[in-house]
Amino acid sequence: MDKIIKTLSKSGHFRAFVLDSTETVKTAQEKHDTMASSTVALGRTLIANQILAVNEKGDTKITLKILASGAVGAIISVANTKGQVKGYIQNPDLDYKRTATGEVIVGPLVGNGQFLVITDYGTGHPYNSMTPLISGEIGEDFAYFLTDSQQTPSAVGLNVLLDEEDKVKVAGGFLLQVLPGATEVEIARFEKRIQEMPAISSLLASENHIEALLSAIYGDDDFKRLSEEEIGFVCDCSKDRFLDALASLPKADLQEMKEEDKGVDITCQFCQTHYHFDENDLEELING
């Protein structure tokens, strides 16, 4: 079970989210059959979107798009306020590692591009916000987005660790934000702690990485846990939803599918679930 823990410093001037997204990224890897670099890039995007979405309320949905010039192409993710996320990567077959360390390469494969966030409040008027990719590592790009676009000083760490067979071993991250009222002394103390923090990969490799993240963020500062919530990879696709999409096509196209193809097969991009619509399904749409 994946989870997110929301916390607030005793002073009320800092808040932090810590996430275990291991099963989320495992599921994404299994559904899309991604190779190492693609797994890490997609996983980081899913974690970033979980953080963005749980920060919203109600039925808001967040679409995060990494529109990259590099080999990954585009990474698309959609999440709701419960931290339920789905996503896919345009190129799932990237597998590049540094020869000396075996470290999975992501940044150069993402390259330049845009970090685009679409916030849908359900009003019919989604809000778009976009910043340039500054490193392609996604975590740094996410932090830049929060600071530049949302005007909220933030520290972010997120990563995906793979085992020797390139399967997801652990995935997760954190978000630390400065809230109104924080003093310069407090900010300096937290900044120093973040600068001296071990690499996110080593924290995730800890036996209890959630507690390791909290300890690294807060040190000796007191904090309270506001909530602990389940999160995960969840796709809300259905045969009825795709049937509605087919119903929007011209009847001549539906007739052609029925007569020439004897039906139609559709695969959900987000979860790779296959749906088959036979001649009877198409006939009902044509006569509907």
From Swiss-Prot:
SUPFAM superfamilies, per the entry: Hsp33 domain, HSP33 redox switch-like
Keyword Cytoplasm: yes
Primary location group: cytoplasm
Cysteines paired by S-S bonds: 235-237, 268-271
Pfam family, one: HSP33
Gene Ontology biological-process annotations: protein refolding
GO molecular function: protein folding chaperone; unfolded protein binding
Subcellular location: Cytoplasm
Gene3D superfamilies: Hsp33 domain (3.55.30.10), HSP33 redox switch-like (3.90.1280.10)
Entry PTM: Under oxidizing conditions two disulfide bonds are formed involving the reactive cysteines. Under reducing conditions zinc is bound to the reactive cysteines and the protein is inactive.
Sorted UniProt keywords: Chaperone, Cytoplasm, Disulfide bond, Redox-active center, Stress response, Zinc
InterPro entries on file: Heat_shock_Hsp33, Heat_shock_Hsp33_C, Heat_shock_Hsp33_N
Gene Ontology cellular-component terms listed: cytoplasm
Role of this protein: Redox regulated molecular chaperone. Protects both thermally unfolding and oxidatively damaged proteins from irreversible aggregation. Plays an important role in the bacterial defense system toward oxidative stress.
Sequence similarity: Belongs to the HSP33 family.
Protein name: 33 kDa chaperonin
